[in-house]
Swiss-Prot record:
Location in or out of the cell: Secreted, Extracellular space, Extracellular matrix
Quaternary structure and interacting proteins, as annotated: Trimers composed of three different chains: alpha 1(XI), alpha 2(XI), and alpha 3(XI). Alpha 3(XI) is a post-translational modification of alpha 1(II). Alpha 1(V) can also be found instead of alpha 3(XI)=1(II).
Organism name: Mus musculus
Biased composition (Polar residues): 315-329
Cited Gene3D superfamilies: 2.60.120.1000, 2.60.120.200
GO molecular function: extracellular matrix structural constituent; metal ion binding
Protein name: Collagen alpha-1(XI) chain
One record GO biological process: embryonic skeletal system morphogenesis
Region listing for Triple-helical region (interrupted), in residue ranges: 418-506
Domain of life: Eukaryota
Disease in which the protein is involved: Defects in Col11a1 are associated with chondrodysplasia, an autosomal recessive disease characterized by skeletal defects caused by abnormalities in the cartilage of limbs, ribs, mandibles and trachea.
Chain positions covered by the region annotation Nonhelical region: 229-417
Length: 1804
């Protein structure tokens, strides 16, 4: 059983779809009461002690200002009390948010409903169940919340035999229960937004209808108030604490969870432990120690004169005020009377009514109905509709004790019951003909029907045992007025029958109860039974029921007969011509364009005033890890390091003598991961594992193979009618079937939509002449026909009426051009032009400050080797040096003795997963594991392969006609079909529409007369034939006398067809009949024998194309086509605007169509809709009376081009039109001839600072670097093959200096090495033991060079040595040949700006510049000579509006016009972003050299020129002075060959096995130490590379800021939203500032208002005037903005940020109380809308700025507390951020406002 099944079974037997509570009381302050509370006990007359109610002592035995204890009422199970809901709520409105307040002491351990509220259909809408687990029952009209979601307060037990004050607050979607002013529990209430509780029903106290559990206990107070906050003040204002000075009142602490869960289950709740998991927000409310109530001397109001409230002092009313402490007296609410306070005794003079004693004589269980006197006055009885869902009952739910009716009514008992009416006869079965069974859609729910007649009385059951005497019943509802009869009309309303009597066998309790409530049998009272009264008036139509669950598809019903075609409606009057609408508001801005190329940098603005320092912003999210910092300075020498790692293996020593056997060693460290072993044998299947967690949802599997065709499924129900499918491809022609038997005539199909006119068919063969048709109805006038052949001149006819206005003719040929118009007025000044071309280079600036230290230069040439220095003192022990490279493998040592067996080592760490092994053999089947939990629903798989074609299904039932489809385009002309056999003549159709007139045929030759036939009897009128063509004019008949109009005779019977008569003489021309619509196709007739060929008939005229026939019945469904190929991926759609937040969940199925509502009031004029498609021509209406001349109609749409008219005569020359609008800009004309040389221009102004350019090409070689420090003198040796790094040997003794070798060739530039400056040299590590040879590793990174080794034996002659030291200067050599170009050097540093060079030659003609800004309007020029006469101008502007003409007749609808001519040129758009840089144009031809310009100012010094050629040898100079001692002499002769040196890392080839082997024996290679200089160089290069990387892709840090958040997003798309540093002007990063980057919104850069500008609290602002700016308020100021760090933003940076921005937005939230912010509903205008001041001092409002929108406008209604959120989203960047706001709607007594300013966000 579901945990909520109690609600399903214990709800009423009707399907309870509960209406919801509606009427909102918004933001009511605690002190402000809503409507007066409803006192339930007073309304139910408790003070008169009805049956089952008695007075008792209440909650307090002692109360201040009262001698007597509180009065309460004891309720026993005999009490049966109810009342109409309207009696409690006379206004008929139940509040949407409310409080239910009661002070009760239920009987211990009970659980029953204290209150049940039903609507007029008997559906329970509201209920409060109290006891061991209180429940709040509420269901709205949509069935929400569902029974399983009813709020259950399972942790509270108020049925513990003690008094409790309980308050329930229902506000919006929560319900809060406060017990004894301390325990507060809030639960969700999932109801609708607008819910209404029906007050037309009944309220039952203490139980539910048909429920056996009754509330038993004491109740002192029971209130319902429309203020949801009243529940929180219950103990203050409604039920104050007792007087604690005397004996304390009963304990009222509720028992919490004092019963076991089993108790609940026994009580039939069956709430599982996990059913209510929502967190209950339990709040302990403060306990007030003492509360006093102020006194008053006011007299008790007259309403309560029938009873007083004890002798306590009347209460004094005070103005409410806030209670600031628990000891202050709590005020009584204003206007709050004693009526709602507790503690008073109702001392009432009871109007005692007749007590009716119920005896047991002659009263059985069926006859003990309580009868209510019908003379109680008019009162509507609200019918409870019967539902038949309840099938089982428990004995407890049967009839209990008898019920009294409402108070004061006289009651009696009688043994009478009304007779039941007889059952009607069974209706005739429906006749459903084949083809008529068409399923219609379900109709809307009909209104409630009238009450049926009473049914027959069933046979009496066995009498039950007499029950105990029941108490007097409660008063029933007043009955409706019946027609007056001799006895009074009675209303039977039983509630329970005799007490414990057993049930009679006749009818069930539910049936009897429902009969008693619904039948309203009228039984005579007093005296013998009188005649049955007349049936009462039918009750009012019930409100629409809530939508039921969707039923199953019904069987298709029969198709109804086709209705008669209604007459055409009268032509409506033409509507008045509407006033021209006001100009529409400015359109919304278009979508942001794609980001343009960066514009030229503007001039830097003046520095702004320093802003206030902002307060510290909120803690930002943790930043990204920063970049590695710069290397710090060397620290002090550290303490002695730990022993270093073992050094490389030493040389092999002599073999030692074996030592004594050692102790067993300690277990060794785990060895390295061994190689993967071979595949082991197949293991035994393991035991079944534990249930695993459900795995994550797998990816969709691959496409499975096509499955076999499944078995044929069972016959399904006919489905709903599908929408018309798309036209399938034409099927293959089938075999010709046998001629079937003639079927029965089917019903006419529904009218199909009128199709497009088909193409003209091929002329058919002559048909057999049809029977003469009866005279058709008079047809309507046809359209004007084409011009026929000249007929015989007729008699002069009477003057006809003026014909309707013809259709507009085709547009005539264009007239000749008119004369040139007068010059137009001068136009307005144009908008600001685009950005100009960059200016000339500026003058050189002042000398800048000294630059930072540059990167170290390249090392100079090797210096001469210095003399050997004195050995230094041993330095302190350095830090441990880096591990040297691995030594080469030493020779294999002798095999040692096997050591003792070590202890077993510990388990090694888990090795890395091995490579996938080969597929093992198939293992045995394992044990089945336990069933896993169901996995999540898989995603939709890929579409499967098309399955095999299934068998042809059964012929489905004919579906209902689908909705009319859209008229398709005209299909291609089909092939001419064979001439069909003639069908049976159809019945006469209704008169058809007037056809188009056919062309007049030429007169044919007269045919031969046929043979004379025998005159037959006059046959009946034949079936009407198709309308004949217009006959030839008949001979003039003799005029007859005018006869009187005779009555219409009855239609005669149909006679048998007569024989064919002879051809008569031609009759007069008949009026053309209206062609009837095409009838349904008749059944195929049997093929007749071919007749004799008749004589050649006259050539008929071309027939008029008939109207399109009705569509035939749908053919059988074709077999489904093969799946088509997948279409190509469509073009991506335009980017949509940001959508609103979607609602949860997919949309539900469409509900049933509701009943038609009452017609609404006429709506306002809507905006003109888009032009619809051309409709079909409707049927022509009857000729109406001629109307008055109308106003001229609006200009019709341009028609389709008609056939070309005959050429008209030349018209008169028209007057000259006014000048036309300027035409669109023409195409670029050809370049004109070169103009004369212009005068020299003035010196241009200083140009704006240009963009930082892309890195330039490599510059010229820089100046030579400073001489490097002297290098070590190199050994001269032959260059050996490059070997791998050798093992580091012990430091050798330094060899003797080698001779200098000749200068070597320059080497190539090396690759960058590892970054980082070299560390301090560490001390030599201790030699370690060599390891075993490992497998060849991958080539490692180039290591640093090893230390110098000892000198080896002399090698073979070396190759050319490295460069030697510089020798002394030799004699001047001869000029050498030009060397080959060296390798391109690295880019040098930027040199200083040289002096300005001489003017260069004129360069080639540059690209066409960007148009300059529009200049100011010049003075008018001198008048030119008269030009030649211009061509005829375009048509002039329209003239003034003429006087209204007379109203023309309604014209025919025009055809769809051609596309109109292009409109006038629109206003010039806003300035676009700079376009992308065009590709460079081809070099232009050289221009004519201009005249020499004025001598310009001296230019800046030029760059140093390239070195000149070496000069010739100069003449001998004078003998100089003796020089200083010279440099070392030239190199000596070659020395002995040197050792092979370790190649530098940048030059070493890849290691190969051969190289390794070739140097294995060279243990002591001497490696030159080049590492220091190289690492520094490569470190610098690497840091340069990183700097460039950071320039290209900034990180958004303080030292590496981005330009805007958009740039940062483009550089790092994966960065999260957060705070980053930006530097819009891209200068020094010292003025960067921190902003919030909203990457989610596309890379917005956001700044925030300072603390004082963030907003103001809501207040009434009594000293301020509406319509003033906030900065003019006493507490106001201009709004200012800060960065995220709280610092003011540099004005220049702000300007640059705006330059880089395409649009900006900012939100402004206005908090209000009865104050409008934007739209004012009361006035229906925006007169009181806020106004904003932009940062460009521009005022923005609703009237002048279309970029301001209200995202949410809650203040428009000016009710209660609300807010309005306004968004300014503008492309005019200077308007944002706003700096001031004007408030216009405040100053009244209840009006308040406050606001919050949001961040300003800029999007680049």
């Amino acid at each position: 059983m579901e945990p909520w099944s109690r609600w399903k079974t214990k709800r009423w037997i009707w399907d309870l779809t509960i209406s919801t509570l509606a009427l909102t009381f918004l933001f009511q302050a605690r002190e402000v009461r809503g409507a007066a509370p409803v006192d339930i006990l007073k309304a139910l007359d408790f003070h008169n002690s009805p049956v089952g109610i008695s007075k008792t002592t209440g909650f307090c035995t002692n109360r201040k200002n009262s001698k007597d204890p509180d009065v309460a009422y004891r309720v026993t199970e005999e009490a049966q009390i109810s009342a109409p809901t309207k009696q409690l709520f006379p206004g008929g409105i139940f509040p949407q948010d409310f409080s239910i307040l009661f002070t009760i002491k239920p009987k211990k351990g009970t659980q029953a409903f204290l209150l049940s509220l039903y609507n007029e259909h008997g559906i329970q809408q509201l209920g409060v169940e109290v006891g061991r687990s209180p429940v709040f029952l509420f269901e709205d009209h949509t069935g929400k919340p569902t029974p399983e979601n009813y709020p259950l307060f399972s942790t509270v037990n108020i049925a513990d035999g003690k008094w409790h004050r309980v308050a329930i607050s229902v506000e919006k979607k929560t319900v809060t229960m406060i017990v004894d002013c301390k325990k507060k529990i809030t639960k969700p209430l999932d109801r609708s937004e607008r819910s209404i509780v029906d007050t037309n029903g009944i309220m039952v106290f203490g139980t539910r209808i048909l429920e056996t559990d009754v509330f038993q206990g004491d109740i002192q107070q029971f209130l319902i108030t429309g203020d949801p906050k009243a529940a929180y003040d219950y103990c203050d204002h409604y039920s104050p604490d007792c007087d604690l000075t005397s004996k304390a009142a009963q304990a009222q602490e509720p028992h919490i969870d004092e019963y076991a869960p089993e108790d609940i289950i026994e009580y039939d709740y069956e709430y599982g432990e996990t059913d209510y998991k929502e967190a209950e927000s339990v709040t302990e409310m403060p306990t007030f120690t003492e509360e006093t109530v102020a006194q008053t001397e006011a007299n008790i109001v007259d309403d309560f004169q029938d009873y007083n409230y004890g002798t306590m002092e009347p209460y004094q009313t005070e103005t409410p005020r806030r209670v600031s402490g628990s000891n202050e007296p709590n005020p009584v609410e204003e206007g709050f009377t004693e009526e709602y306070l507790t503690g008073e005794d109702y001392d009432v003079q009871r109007n005692t009514s007749e007590d009716i004693l119920y005896g047991n004589k002659g009263v059985d269980g069926r006859d003990s109905d309580l009868l209510v006197d019908g003379d109680l006055g008019e009162y509507d009885f609200y019918e409870y509709k019967e539902y038949e869902e309840r099938t089982t009952t428990s004995p407890n739910e049967e009839f209990g004790p008898g019920v009294p009716a409402e108070t004061d009514f006289t009651e009696t008992s009688i043994n009478g019951h009304g007779a039941y009416g007889e059952k009607g006869q069974k209706g005739e079965p429906a006749v459903v003909e084949p083809g008529m069974l068409v399923e219609g859609p379900p109709g809307p729910a009909g209104p409630a029907g009238l009450m049926g007649p009473p049914g027959l009385q069933g046979p009496s059951g066995l009498p039950g045992d007499p029950g105990d005497r029941g108490p007097p019943g409660r008063p029933g509802l007043p009955g409706a007025d019946g027609l007056p009869g001799p006895p009074g009309t009675m209303l039977m309303l039983p509630f329970r029958y005799g007490g414990d009597g057993s049930k009679g066998p006749t009818i069930s309790a539910q049936e009897a109860q429902a009969q008693a409530i619904l039948q309203q049998a009228r039984i005579a009272l007093r005296g013998p039974p009188g005649p049955m009264g007349l049936t009462g008036r039918p009750g009012p139509v019930g409100g629409p029921g809530s939508a039921g669950a969707k039923g199953e598809s019904g069987d298709p019903g029969p198709q109804g007969p086709r209705g008669v075609q209604g007459p055409p409606g009268p032509t409506g009057k033409p509507g008045k011509r509407g006033r021209p609408g006001a100009d529409g508001g400015r359109g919304m801005p278009g979508e942001s364009g794609s980001k343009g190329d960066r514009g030229f940098d503007g001039l830097p603005g003046l520095p702004g005033d320093k802003g206030h320092r902002g307060e510290r912003g909120p803690q930002g999210p943790p930043g990204l890890p920063g970049d590695d910092g710069m290397r710090g300075e060397d620290g002090e020498i550290g303490p002695r390091g730990l022993p270093g790692e073992a050094g490389p293996r030493g040389l092999l020593g002599p073999r030692g003598t074996p030592g004594p056997p050692g102790q067993p060693g300690i277990g060794g460290i785990d060895g390295p991961q061994g190689p993967k072993g071979n595949m082991g044998p197949q293991g035994e299947p393991g035991p079944p594992g534990q249930q695993g967690n459900p795995g994550p949802q797998g990816l969709p599997g691959p496409q499975g193979p096509i499955g076999p065709p499944g078995e044929k499924g069972p016959q399904g129900k006919p489905g709903l009618a599908g929408l018309p499918g798309a036209d399938g491809p034409p099927g293959h022609p089938g075999k010709e079937g046998q001629s079937g038997e003639k079927g029965a005539l089917g019903p006419p199909g529904p009218q199909g939509p009128i199709g497009y006119p088909g193409p003209r068919g091929v002329k058919g063969a002559d048909g057999v002449r049809g029977l003469k048709g009866s005279k058709g109805e008079k047809g309507e006038d046809g359209f004007p026909g084409f011009k026929g052949d000249m007929g015989l001149k007729g008699d002069r006819g009477e003057v006809g009426q003026v014909g309707p206005r013809g259709e507009d003719g085709p547009e005539g040929p264009k007239g000749r051009a008119g004369p040139t118009g007068d010059p137009g007025p001068s136009g307005q000044a144009g908008e600001k032009g685009k950005l100009g071309v960059p200016g000339l280079p500026g003058y050189p600036g002042r000398q800048g400050p000294k630059g930072s230290t540059g990167f170290p230069g390249f090392p100079g040439a090797n210096g001469e080797k210095g003399a050997r220095g004195i050995a230094g003192k041993p330095g302190p022990r350095g830090q441990r040096g880096p591990t040297g490279p691995r030594g080469s493998r030493g020779a294999r040592g002798p095999t040692g003795k096997p050591g003792p067996k070590g202890t077993s080592g510990g388990d090694g760490p888990p090795g890395p997963p091995g490579e996938r092994g080969p597929q093992g053999p198939q293992g045995p089947v394992g044990f089945p594991g336990p069933k896993g939990p169901p996995g999540p629903a898989g995603k939709d798989g890929l579409p499967g392969h098309p399955g095999q074609r299934g068998e042809t299904g059964f012929q489905g039932k004919t579906g209902p006609p689908g909705p009319g489809g859209v008229v398709g385009p005209q299909g291609p002309t089909g092939e001419t079909g064979p001439i069909g056999e003639r069908g049976h003549p159809g019945p006469p159709g209704p008169p058809g529409e007037q056809g188009l007139p056919g062309a007049a045929g030429k007169e044919g030759a007269k045919g031969d007369p046929g043979p004379q036939g025998i005159s037959g009897k006059d046959g009946p009128a034949g079936i009407r034939g198709f309308p004949g063509e217009r006959g030839l004019p008949g001979a003039q008949g003799a005029p007859g006398l005018k006869g009187g109009e005779g009555p219409q005779g009855p239609q005669g019977p149909v006679g048998s067809p007569g024989e064919r008569g002879s051809a008569g003489t031609a009759g007069p021309i008949g009026l053309p009949g209206r062609p009837g619509p095409q009838g349904p196709p008749g059944p195929a007739g049997e093929k007749g024998a071919p007749g004799e060929k008749g004589p050649q008939g006259p050539a008929g005229r071309d027939g008029v194309q008939g109207p399109v026939g009705l569509p035939g019945p749908a053919g059988p469904a074709g077999s489904p086509g093969e799946d088509g190929d997948k279409g190509e991926i469509g073009e991506p759609g335009q980017k949509g605007s940001k959508g609103d937040k979607g609602e949860n969940g997919p949309p539900g199925p469409p509900g049933l169509q509701g009943p038609v509502g009452a017609p609404g009031i006429a709506g306002g004029d809507g905006e003109p809709g888009p032009r619809g498609q051309q409709g079909m021509f409707g049927q022509k209406g009857d000729e109406g009376a001629r109307g008055f001349p109308g106003l001229p109609g609006p200009i019709g749409l341009q028609g389709l081009p008609g056939p070309p008219g005959e050429k008209g005569e030349n018209g008169d020359v028209g007057p000259m039109g006014p000048p036309g609008p300027p035409g669109p800009r023409g195409p670029q004309g050809p370049n004109g001839a070169d103009g004369p040389q212009g005068p020299p221009g003035s010196i241009g102004s200083v140009g704006v600072v240009g963009d930082k350019g892309e890195p330039g090409e490599a510059g010229n070689p820089g100046p030579p670097g400073e001489a490097g420090s002297g290098g070590l003198k190199g050994e001269r040796g032959e260059k050996g093959e490059a070997g791998p790094p050798g093992a580091a040997g012990p430091a050798g003794i330094k060899g003797p200096p080698g001779d200098d070798g000749p200068k070597g060739n320059p080497g190539p530039v090396g690759f960058p090495g590892d970054p980082g400056p070299p560390g301090e040299p560490g001390p030599a590590g201790q030699d370690g033991v060599g390891g075993d040879k490992g497998e060849d590793g991958d080539p490692g990174q180039p290591g640093p060079p090893g230390p110098s080794g000892e000198a080896g034996p002399p090698g073979p002659p070396g190759k050319r040595g490295p460069p030697g030291a510089s020798g002394s200067e030799g004699r001047q050599g001869e000029k050498g040949a030009k060397g080959e170009a060296g390798a391109e050097g690295p880019p040098g540093k930027t040199g200083p700006v040289g002096p300005q060079g001489p003017s260069g030659k004129p360069g080639p003609e540059g690209l066409r510049g960007i148009p300059g800004p529009v200049g100011e309007q010049g003075l008018p020029g001198a008048a030119g000579q008269d030009g030649p006469p211009g061509p005829l101008g375009p048509p002039g502007l329209p003239g003034l509006k003429g006087d209204p003409g007379s109203k023309g007749e309604k014209g025919h609808p025009g055809l769809i016009g051609l596309i109109g001519p292009p409109g006038e040129q629109g206003e010039k758009g806003d300035r676009g972003l700079p376009g992308t840089q065009g590709s460079p144009g081809a070099k232009g031809d050289g221009g004519i050299p201009g005249p020499a310009g004025p001598i310009g100012p001296p230019g800046p010094p030029g760059l140093p020129g390239p070195a000149g050629p070496k000069g010739n040898k100069g003449s001998s100079g004078p003998t100089g002075q003796k020089g200083d001692s010279g440099m070392p002499g030239p190199p000596g002769p070659p020395g002995p060959p040197g050792e092979v040196i370790q190649p530098l890392p940048i030059l070493s080839p890849k290691k190969t096995r051969r190289h390794t082997e070739s140097i294995q024996g060279d243990a002591g290679d001497n490696i030159l130490d080049y590492s220091d200089g190289m690492e520094e160089i490569f470190g610098s290069l690497n840091s340069l590379k990183q700097d460039i990387e950071h320039m290209k892709f900034p990180m958004g840090t303080q030292t590496n800021p981005a330009r805007t958040c958009k740039d940062l997003q483009l550089s790092h798309p994966d960065f999260p939203d957060g705070e980053y540093w930006i530097d819009p002007n891209q200068g020094c990063s010292g003025d960067s500032f921190k902003v919030y980057c909203n990457f989610t919104a596309g890379g917005e850069t956001c700044i925030y208002p300072d603390k004082k500008s963030e907003g103001v609290r809501i207040s009434s602002w009594p000293k301020e005037k509406p319509g003033s700016w906030y900065s003019e308020f006493k507490r106001g100021k201009l709004l200012s903005y800060l960065d995220v760090e709280g610092n003011s933003i540099n004005m220049v940076q702000m300007t640059f940020l705006k330059l880089l921005t395409a649009s900006a937005r900012q939100n402004f939230t206005y908090n209000c109380h009865q104050s409008a912010a934007w739209y004012d509903v009361l006035s229906g205008s925006y007169d009181k809308a806020l106004r904003f001041l932009g940062s460009n001092d521009e005022e923005m409002s609703y009237e002048n700025n279309p970029h301001i929108k209200a995202l949410y406008d809650g203040c428009a209604s000016r009710k209660g507390y609300e807010k309005t959120v306004i968004e300014i989203n503008t492309p005019k960047i200077d308007q944002v951020p706003i700096i001031d706001v004007m408030i216009n709607d405040f100053g009244d007594q209840n009006q308040k406002f406050g606001f919050e300013v949001g961040p300003a966000c800029f999007l680049g």
